[in-house]
């Protein structure tokens, strides 16, 4: 039986959620030719979803994410389109959802670290919307067991409604680039020396200040010839970053590349000597497994989902302890055998994360929600709900 399924893809251009949406949609397109899909996108993002299969179509939705408009206008669209199921790829559901509802909740950092939010209003909005989605959603998808546990503990909800579906790693990170491609890309970005890589947005929980301080301290512990390269839009905090680098004598060692196109990311990963990601909190930590798939040793945090994903496969540190991060960097840079061991472990771990598997499990969640007795209004038993 074919169903009409709507997916909120308005955040498709975003750094984190956008990666999730782009790869999930592509993998669903390769997996499922039976159901009909409607993708809600903003006007400026419709070109991102070119070359979709025939059972996918795009609907322009001008309501901004996290706005009052989306609560009303998306509800109206869902009524008009007569969908069987709607998948919200972030934590907000429209005011009324006249069909089955799936909600992906990537993390609850808004609630665990309210000091990072711009205002108390943002905290109360996130809290209310997540609580509402947990109540009204037929199924909840969490990026990790850590996020599922956070949801259960913070909101005191029944975990049987929440299904853990890990994101995947794009195959482009596993594909080895040629030396010619490597040389060309590094030259385009002006990278002339070996480098350590950090990938992330400018939000405080990414812990970039501690990364810079730890990099400087590592150079004191074990001097090495390498730069610190940071990928991600950080225009809002660039002055503070450069000021910190100047204070530490790193002005010529810090390279801020800003936003980088998806096509260039695998090359930048594969060119790195070491990947640094000691963030304070992650719902999954996709850059970690991207680095692992790229055959780069990883230093990351022993907290949140990062421990779940990387323990035993990366060098874990306390993200609040600059000295510990610095010693990890120094050890990795001094000990080639240690780096090689981390590379082998990381490649093995990255095999656990494929977008084809994410799509299969997401489609299984869809079918679980749709599998109901139409006469009694009760769902059939889904064995995965007991997990």
List PLM regions with ranges.
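Carbohydrate transferase catalytic cores enriched for Leloir-type hexosyltransferases
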Residues: 1-387
């Amino acid at each position: 039986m074919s169903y009409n399924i709507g997916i909120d893809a308005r955040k498709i251009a975003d750094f984190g959620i956008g990666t999730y949406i782009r790869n999930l949609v592509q993998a669903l397109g390769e997996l499922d030719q039976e159901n009909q899909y409607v993708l809600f996108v903003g006007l400026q993002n419709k070109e991102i979803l070119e070359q979709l299969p025939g059972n996918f179509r795009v609907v322009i939705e001008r309501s901004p994410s996290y706005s009052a408009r989306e609560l009303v206008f998306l509800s109206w669209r869902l009524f008009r389109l007569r969908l069987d199921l709607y998948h919200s790829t972030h934590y907000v559901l429209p005011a009324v959802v006249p069909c089955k509802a799936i909600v992906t909740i990537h993390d609850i950092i808004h609630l665990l670290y309210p000091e990072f939010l711009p205002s108390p209003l943002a905290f109360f909005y996130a809290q209310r919307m997540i609580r509402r989605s947990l109540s009204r959603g037929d199924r909840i998808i969490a990026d990790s067991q850590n996020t599922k546990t956070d949801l259960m503990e913070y909101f005191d909800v029944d975990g049987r409604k929440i299904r853990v579906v890990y994101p995947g790693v794009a195959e482009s990170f596993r594909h080895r680039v040629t030396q010619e491609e490597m040389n060309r890309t590094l030259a385009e970005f002006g990278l002339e020396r070996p480098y350590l890589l950090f990938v992330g947005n400018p939000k405080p929980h990414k812990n970039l200040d501690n990364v810079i301080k730890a990099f400087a301290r590592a150079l004191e512990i074990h001097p090495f010839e390498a730069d610190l390269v940071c990928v991600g839009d950080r225009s809002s905090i660039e002055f503070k970053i450069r000021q910190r680098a100047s204070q530490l004598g790193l002005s010529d060692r810090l390279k801020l590349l800003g936003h980088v196109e998806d096509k260039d990311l695998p090359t930048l990963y594969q060119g790195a000597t070491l990947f640094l990601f000691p963030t304070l909190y992650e719902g999954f930590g996709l850059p970690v497994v991207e680095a692992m798939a790229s055959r780069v040793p990883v230093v990351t945090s022993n907290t949140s989902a990062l421990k779940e994903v990387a323990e035993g496969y990366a060098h874990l540190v306390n993200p609040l302890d600059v000295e510990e991060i610095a010693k990890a960097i120094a050890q990795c840079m001094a000990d080639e055998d240690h780096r090689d061991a981390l590379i082998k472990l990381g490649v093995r771990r990255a095999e656990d994360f494929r977008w084809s598997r994410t799509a299969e499990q997401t489609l299984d969640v869809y079918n679980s929600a749709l599998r109901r007795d139409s006469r009694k209004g009760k769902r059939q038993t889904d064995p995965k709900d007991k997990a």
